[in-house]
Amino acid sequence: MDWAEIETIVYSEHDHPENILGPHKVKGGVLIQAFLPDAKTVFVRSKKSGMFIQMSQTDEDGCFAALMESRKIVSYEYVIDYGDGKEYWQKDPYLYGNLIPEQALEDFNAGKAYDIYRYLGAHPVAVKGIGKDVLVDWNPMAASTKRSDMVQGTFFAVWAPNAMRVSVVGDFNQWDGRRHPMCRLGDSGVFGLFIPD
């Protein structure tokens, strides 16, 4: 673990949190890292096998890590105990990657993205798959797309070319900008993050 990188998450100074948080292939498996302030214990549950792996707390501010013995990145979710006697199940936003098509970002950089409104702002979406292989349904309210194999959520994107970092905040994360830092998408100045329901 790179402690300097971890500190950039803790102090909200990283514009590419996906380079630290979420799943990463390493020697021996897949390293999963999360920043969950106030959590007492965290488990990773593989959706494929149903197996639970306890995460180690690597930093007193709320950084957790676990090594999943797997050759490839698989879908998973967190099971979190905040010490209030309840279990909270949460999907990892950093499992899904960028949802804006690369061509749309290239057009935006060139000043010819006439439909960028389709991506900027907050949009309910449904996704299937993980990482770079994710398929996005930008119209998840249609009856034909309400399928159990798709993850429902909201995709947030904003153009902030001079920002050091951008976060999604609200009641759902105690207005804590460290909990959902957005990812800088290439050289476009756009930051984005998909937050599953």
Model-flagged regions — what are they?
Residues 1-38, 90-164:
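Non-catalytic, glycine-rich low-complexity segments
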Residues 23, 31-73, 79-98, 127, ...:
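Aromatic-rich carbohydrate-binding modules that target alpha-glucans
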